[in-house]
């Protein structure tokens, strides 16, 4: 895993078309902004896992099934 340090307002690049910008830090929460082409899906991890479990027909942890 690559670990980077960024300050509020600073950006990192993923490939040529995806940028991640630190928008703010409040306590232990970090707000980030992601700019990516429409064909690139961007999800929080828990949402991505729910999507994957729904595709496979397996209930996700904490799901309402």
UniProtKB/Swiss-Prot annotation:
Keyword Plastid: no
One of the record's GO molecular function terms: mRNA 5'-UTR binding
Primary location recorded for the protein, binned into one broad class: cytoplasm
Alphabetized UniProt keyword annotations: Activator, Cytoplasm, Repressor, RNA-binding, Translation regulation
Subunit structure: Homodimer; the beta-strands of each monomer intercalate to form a hydrophobic core, while the alpha-helices form wings that extend away from the core.
Function: A key translational regulator that binds mRNA to regulate translation initiation and/or mRNA stability. Mediates global changes in gene expression, shifting from rapid growth to stress survival by linking envelope stress, the stringent response and the catabolite repression systems. Usually binds in the 5'-UTR; binding at or near the Shine-Dalgarno sequence prevents ribosome-binding, repressing translation, binding elsewhere in the 5'-UTR can activate translation and/or stabilize the mRNA. Its function is antagonized by small RNA(s).
Protein name: Translational regulator CsrA
Gene designation per UniProt: csrA
